Amino acid sequence: MFQSLIAIDYGKARIGIASGQMITKTATPIGTVETYDGVPNWIELDKIIKRWNPSDIIIGLPLDTQNFETDITKSAKDFAKEVQQRYQRKVHLINEAYSTREARWRLEEVKSKKVSHIKVDALAACVILETWMSEN
């Protein structure tokens, strides 16, 4: 059974991270980890995984609006394989279409004074996790 979960919004500049619980079906933004040319700061990601100890990791798969792969899809799939091997957790890929748009909309709704990339990326990870939890 799923315990705690981590969701990742993969990107070439940074990855957004959120945590969640299946029992409550809630997700909370944790923050971001910088990436360098698509390679994450593994030391920072290691710390997050160790701290939250998720049973499963959900990674957003960047597809276009017609569910076709994009330039970044292969990088996200490679990243997901590395995460699975590195942390020995079950990794689930989910279409992340519109997660960033939804995150921006949520921040605007709460009248966030500063819509930063960090907030958007972490909140996009929440959207990814909430979507996955609602489907599972």
UniProtKB/Swiss-Prot annotation:
Keywords: Cytoplasm, Hydrolase, Nuclease, Ribosome biogenesis. The keyword Transcription does not apply. One of its GO terms (molecular function) is nuclease activity. InterPro entries: RNaseH-like_sf, YqgF, YqgF/RNaseH-like_dom, YqgF/RNaseH-like_dom_sf. It holds the Pfam family RuvX. GO terms for cellular component: cytosol. Its EC number is 3.1.-.-. SMART domains: YqgFc. The keyword Transport does not apply. It is found in: Cytoplasm. One of its GO terms (biological process) is rRNA 5'-end processing. Could be a nuclease involved in processing of the 5'-end of pre-16S rRNA. NCBIfam families: RNAse_H_YqgF. Belongs to the YqgF nuclease family. PANTHER family: POLYNUCLEOTIDYL TRANSFERASE, RIBONUCLEASE H-LIKE SUPERFAMILY PROTEIN (PTHR33317:SF4). This is Putative pre-16S rRNA nuclease.
